[in-house]
């Protein structure tokens, strides 16, 4: 049986997979579940993983696969079969296969590689005319391009210097999503996006860095993170 928070989290992950094709970030899960810290998300994910509901895909950030799903919430209404506090925070489950239709494992597509992007202070986003071969299974629907990550400000999100960030083109994003933000029409950076009191805040995922705050007209969303590729030397 799952706790109510575990049930809520797996439902949220499934919803985001169906909507966007990628699992939510830890920041998005923290906000969706109204948790105070990302450590609470880590504990919930570890518990779901131990119980065989999800698994983390190796060498990929924001890569969660649902293996089975909770079906019925126990507690309240006609389905309440338990009593007291236990019934209010525990859910009964029936296993069900996750609805995933992965691309053939050998399918490779080439997407544009547009230079380097800062996971630190903003740097110029280069428009190099190169391409990057990517397993099709890593990409969902939409138009994509790649940027090579420079810096360490997103390491707590599993994004490291030298990684290739796979970006889905879009000019809009929700709070808490990792985006490519063009600042003052000349510099690009990879950060969590937040809107706060009429300002735009670009948050790092590294306690050594401070958030960057701008007026809305200074920041243009040019895409959001869809996946990562990493080279091992």
Swiss-Prot record:
Catalytic residues (positions): 153 (for autocatalytic cleavage activity), 191 (for autocatalytic cleavage activity)
Site (Cleavage): 119-120
The entry's keywords: Autocatalytic cleavage, DNA damage, DNA repair, DNA replication, DNA-binding, Hydrolase, Repressor, SOS response, Transcription, Transcription regulation
DNA-binding region: 26-46
GO molecular function: DNA binding; serine-type endopeptidase activity
E.C. designation(s): 3.4.21.88
Pfam family, one: Peptidase_S24
Gene Ontology biological-process annotations: DNA repair; DNA replication; negative regulation of DNA-templated transcription; proteolysis; SOS response
Membrane-spanning parts: none
Reactions it catalyzes: Hydrolysis of Ala-|-Gly bond in repressor LexA
Family classification: Belongs to the peptidase S24 family.
Known function: Represses a number of genes involved in the response to DNA damage (SOS response), including recA and lexA. In the presence of single-stranded DNA, RecA interacts with LexA causing an autocatalytic cleavage which disrupts the DNA-binding part of LexA, leading to derepression of the SOS regulon and eventually DNA repair.
NCBIfam families: lexA
Subunit annotation: Homodimer.
HAMAP family for the chain: LexA (MF_00015)
Name of the protein: LexA repressor
The species this protein was found in: Erythrobacter litoralis (strain HTCC2594)
